[in-house]
């Protein structure tokens, strides 16, 4: 991987797709120390900001980018190009958290327009992924057993590298 341009790096045996910023004017300067970096520990997430040592518990909807360096950066209000400083990214979207738990995430980014087929590049759990179109339809608000048929079909056809996770509560 070292020495290759990001578009030639390999993720899970495939070539990574890098998404350019389609709206350079949206890459406005912002306070960089206000942008969060996401970390996870099992199914709990924490945010770190700038040089602070404090951890924050995410508890709202955030705009995120996955940089070509592998960091997931987020902010509740800044736009994707501002967070990424206009640079190309591995993925961009929105993520909703509830007291440190990821509820859902999507490819909702009009400036990068990442496709669902490369959603695994975001580094977030695929079982909580919804396409932007599904979010607009409100399908992300349904119980997890009612995954949209369009996404289920893609998973079954192997278009998205999704691992099945065992169900909790004895399979109910």
Descriptions of predicted regions:
Residues 2-171:
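Eukaryotic phosphoinositide-binding membrane-targeting regions
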């Amino acid at each position: 991987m070292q020495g290759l341009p990001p578009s030639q790096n390999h993720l899970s045996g495939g070539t990574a797709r890098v998404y350019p910023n389609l709206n350079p004017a949206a890459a406005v300067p912002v306070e960089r120390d206000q942008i969060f970096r996401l970390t996870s520990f099992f199914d709990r997430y924490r945010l770190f900001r700038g040089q602070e040592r404090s951890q924050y518990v995410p508890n709202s909807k955030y705009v995120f980018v996955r940089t070509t360096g592998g960091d997931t950066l987020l902010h509740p209000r800044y736009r994707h190009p501002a967070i990424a400083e206009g640079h190309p990214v591995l993925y961009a979207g929105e993520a909703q958290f509830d007291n440190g738990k990821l509820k859902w995430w999507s490819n909702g980014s009009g400036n990068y327009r990442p496709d669902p087929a490369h959603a695994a590049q975001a580094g977030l759990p695929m079982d909580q992924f919804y396409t932007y179109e599904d979010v607009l339809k409100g399908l992300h608000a349904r119980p997890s057993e009612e995954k949209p048929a369009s996404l289920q079909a893609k998973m079954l056809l192997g278009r998205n590298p999704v691992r099945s996770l065992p169900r909790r509560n004895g399979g109910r």
